[in-house]
């Protein structure tokens, strides 16, 4: 059936995490609307509250009164949220706290050495389970600034170092191989921190005065929007408009891929919200051409690769995603989860030299295997609905991690 709809979505998850953390130590009262309503962001709220942060829901607003944070009484449970675990490691260290971080079974398999190494170099005493959660961090002694070259492109690791650097005795410098999402840098600049960005080199100075509070309407999450966009693109004679969507250049690799395969997109009402470019974006359905994604684009579409792989399944040939090994360290081994689901749906897909290959074809009906991973679940529900108008899935509860309103939006689109 044809889709012709306009949707408004919950706020960007990455921005929501960062806004909560920085507002919790700002000098005054911050108000946030359209905060992401998923379980991951709730994990960050509960973690900050365990450290004494004042965070209250007031109607549609979340009100945060900045104050000095304190050591939590118990280990902090980050649930399924890698962003919470990695960013809080640096952020709470900047406040010279002693704390422990735990997580669910999935998060407890994800690599933490990538933050343990730089934070230890800065002066944190860290105990871990052989590089995995739980982590116990003692940052009560003075922290020193570091010069750190990132071994992998990771906004979480970069942000952990930059946030820790706020409480260091000297400046910290981070050098990236490829640009990753820069919400931490933008928000720090807008809240009064001294941070200098020169291409892929970022320097942050220790905070000499408190951060300025913010009033923020969080723009729509483009990673969440991607599922609905692809469903519309795969539906003949369809179009969808996403209102007030985040258009940060480090987050629109997904749109760039769509434009490369001649999917028509129209942007209107462009504006900035606290340094972040946003706008209303229209996407119009079209036949799908196969495509190739170069390695340097992968960091900017890492969360959208599952849904782009679904798009490729309907393509006219072989699609190649180069250097996607980082997918193996997400909420699931997403690389294998994508391949397994595509094969279940009758689409040939395989790994070759750390690249993902998808050969377009005609899907056959199957049950979606979620691997308890929200993005895998949503991506392959879209595939099933686009191909058959219905779906079966082994676990849909995991979708609440990032987008509790997913099914409501699907229902609106199809009504």
Q: How would you name each of these model-derived features?
A:
Residues 1-415:
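Structural preference for solvent-exposed beta-strand-turn elements
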